[in-house]
Amino acid sequence: EMCIRDRCARFRVRELRCERIRYLLYEPPDWDIEEAINGEAPLPVLFLHGLGFGVPQYVFAIRALLGVPGRARRPVLVPELPWMSHEFFSPEYLYPWQAPEAADTIESIVRLHGFERCGISVISHSMGTITHSFLIKRCTSMVRRSVLVDPVCFQLWVPEVCYRFLYKRADSFVELMLRYFVARELGIANTITRHFEWSSNVLLPNELPNANDPQRTRIFLAGSDTVLDAPGVQKYLARNGIVDTVTYVPGEHHGGTIMVPNRHLDDMVSWLDEGLSMEGDAIASLESSSTEAA
């Protein structure tokens, strides 16, 4: 963790707090919010990590988001969630947030830095897609573009995710690691078994705005995912008209498209680099929201 914080300091990343949550913030000096509003600069990015070791396990993804020479740079927000990250010394370790608090806290962070004026892009992985779904349902106009990687937020009424993550006999080294170092870790086990509101956490296809618009939404599925039934999720999304935004990666494992350097991670970041013109109803909605908040 100290190594990660040293890297953050080198990239001029600040650690701040809002309500119960610490978060990392990077604001590039050459980024201009007016350009983002006009679609001439990338939108700020909110990164929502999954279960495991928190920010350190996503070092490659976060480093890519912070920008490299010759690539567009944007503000990056990364909430640190102790109940999902082995942070057993945190006073919040056994007190995970639920949908209302999650949406309200993240909206407060976004407004604190003025990013509600242009809206944000959100990239989430695994359990992070559930927090992503809270935002989509409660702060619809604020979330301008979405990348959902290994999304466990779909089809939570089927048994695969629960069974594979908590009960299935481990048949591989990857599954063994997930079982003993993730699923049975105290904070994560407490979150999953005592504070997991299935009905609030599920995201229905009709609740995902622009679900089949490749300029607004991207969904990445790993064909050999050990947590969710990726082929089943792909078929479910296709039945609901969500085809053009889905990238299915045969043979890839859970986290493989975002935790290590690969062409799919490059694809995600390149997609986020694109400016997004805000016209018509979208900008009117954002202006209306800002006026009401004021």
Explain the meaning of each model-derived region.
Residues 2-4:
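Short, small-residue-biased leader/transition segments that mark boundaries at the very start
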Residues 16-73, 80-82:
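Short, surface-exposed "cap/lid" segments of acyl-processing enzymes
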Residues 61, 229-239:
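Short alpha-helix in the alpha/beta-hydrolase fold that links the catalytic acid
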Residues 81, 147-157:
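Active-site nucleophile loop of the alpha/beta-hydrolase fold
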Residues 100-119:
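Conserved acidic catalytic loop of the alpha/beta-hydrolase fold
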Residues 123-132:
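Gly/Ala-rich beta-loop-alpha elbow adjacent to hydrolase catalytic centers
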Residues 213, 219-221:
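Short beta-strand/loop motif that positions the catalytic acidic residue
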Residues 244-294:
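Catalytic active-site module of serine/aspartate enzymes centered on a nucleophile-bearing elbow/loop
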